[in-house]
């Protein structure tokens, strides 16, 4: 883990975009748990709002970031297509390729079922805002643990490998 500290969100996002734009750092595929409806929209909107649309479009090697709407259970969600980068949401892959229904599709539940591991507990905080403002170190560890759980799910299940094989065969 490469942890960097910044005094402002502007500096953080500028540094991230500068790092991302280095060709060897730009991914061909991004993944995460519910990344299509949470992580990517959050990142795109924060970059757009804090440092501007021009730099937000640099997330795409082609300068093409488009907004789309999807409806789940009648509720509208915004998602973004980042041209030149495939988004393989591990939650979607799990639902598509594991032919069994689960009582919950939260990462914590699926990690327990598949890996016998759980997310880092943060129940001592009343709200998520309290968590990241009053327990910063644990908040960082919580996010790292989430990434590790998705990585371990892929190590075990090979769903990204399967999706890529199906796409290119």
Language-model regions: role of each:
Residues 59-60, 64-169:
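Conserved "right-hand" nucleotidyltransferase catalytic core of DNA-directed polymerases
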Residues 1-45, 49-54, 133-142:
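A conserved hydrophobic secondary-structure block that centers on an alpha-helix together
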